[in-house]
Design a protein with these regions (language model features):
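N-terminal amphipathic/hydrophobic interface segments
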Residues: 1-324
Length: 324
């Protein structure tokens, strides 16, 4: 389908000097595949079905996409636009700012090869490269991805995001950073609408007090609850304590972690290590107090002593052990 010129204040054509194009100047507008494009001036290459446009570039595709920039090369045979300058793409769901957009009007996919910024509701997303599929409101971000939100920031290598469902998918090393903790994973998803997430591959939660690791991690931000599965480790570097297990439940508001499924505790002293087994361990921290609880069927041993009981409480603050 040929590019249709809708308007130009002045049109220049000279078959002897430049037989392959027309020069269009002033309030230029043209139509192709239901997209209206406007600019200050343009070259219309009739045989190639191509336009080179300059000035205040604007592309309107129905009521879904508006794209502005300073220079446009439009390839009519391929239905592709290359827009450069201060480029802004706007639809109902987001705004993209960058210095170059490659836009396919057939597939409605826009990509940017250089640094871009997405503004979506209360989030700002930056990445070196990215693409946006407007039909399904889906983004792909690559290289140095940074998400800035009022409650948390995300740093990752590769990320997919759908602005309709508001679900984010992570690929590669990823950090979710908030005021009091950092969550790490190498694969997973986060629903920013419900604040529910599932993280996989070398996952951990890190706070000032401890590191909680596992093969996978379920997290509900609204309930301040997390659950780690398989190869679980609770590492308290301040107290030189590590608790191993199969499952760990994390209660953020209560500052409590419950570790179960064949758990074992290691407590390092200056010249020795205390080992302890029980059905489950509970690590709890309150203002001025930090405790580890073990129950039931507690057994423990160290080089110079060993013992067993039904339940045990150890207070790190005053080093008091209570057995029941």
């Amino acid at each position: 389908k040929k590019i249709e010129i809708l308007n130009a204040d002045n049109t220049y054509a000279n078959a002897n000097i430049h037989p392959d194009y027309w020069r269009l100047i002033g309030n230029v507008s043209f139509l192709h595949n239901n997209a209206v494009m406007t600019c200050d001036s343009a070259y219309h290459y009739t045989y190639e079905n191509k336009m080179e446009a300059f000035g205040e570039i604007k592309i309107n595709q129905g009521d879904s996409i508006t794209l502005t920039g300073e220079k446009l090369t439009y390839f009519g045979l391929e239905n592709k636009a290359d827009i450069t300058g201060d480029v802004v793409l706007i639809d109902k769901h987001m705004t993209l700012k960058t210095n170059q957009v490659l836009y396919n009007l057939s597939t409605n996919i826009a990509s940017y090869p250089n640094q871009g910024e997405i503004i979506d509701n209360e989030k700002i997303i930056n990445s070196k490269r990215g693409a946006y599929h407007s039909n399904i409101h889906s983004f792909i971000f690559k290289d140095s991805v940074v998400v800035i939100n009022k409650d948390y920031n995300i740093l990752t290598d590769n990320m997919r995001y759908n602005s309709s469902s508001e679900v984010t998918y992570f690929f590669g090393p990823s950090f979710i950073i908030s005021d009091n903790k950092t969550i790490y994973c190498e694969n997973g998803w986060y629903n920013t609408k419900t604040d529910i997430a599932q993280f996989r591959e070398n996952t951990y939660i890190s706070t000032e007090s401890y590191l909680l690791k596992g093969d996978s991690l379920y997290y509900n931000k609204n309930k301040q609850y997390g659950k780690a599965f398989s190869n679980v480790q609770l590492i308290d570097t301040v107290e030189n304590m590590t608790v191993y297990g199969g499952i760990a439940e994390y209660f953020e508001e209560e500052e409590k972690i419950i570790i179960s499924k064949k758990p074992m505790l290691e407590l390092l002293f200056e010249k020795d290590t205390l080992f302890m087994h029980a059905k489950q361990f509970v690590s709890q921290q309150k203002p001025g107090e930090k405790k580890i609880l073990a129950y039931p069927k507690v057994t423990f041993f160290k080089t110079d002593f060993q013992g067993k009981c039904d339940s045990l409480s150890y207070n790190f603050t005053d080093s008091v052990v209570e057995m029941f």
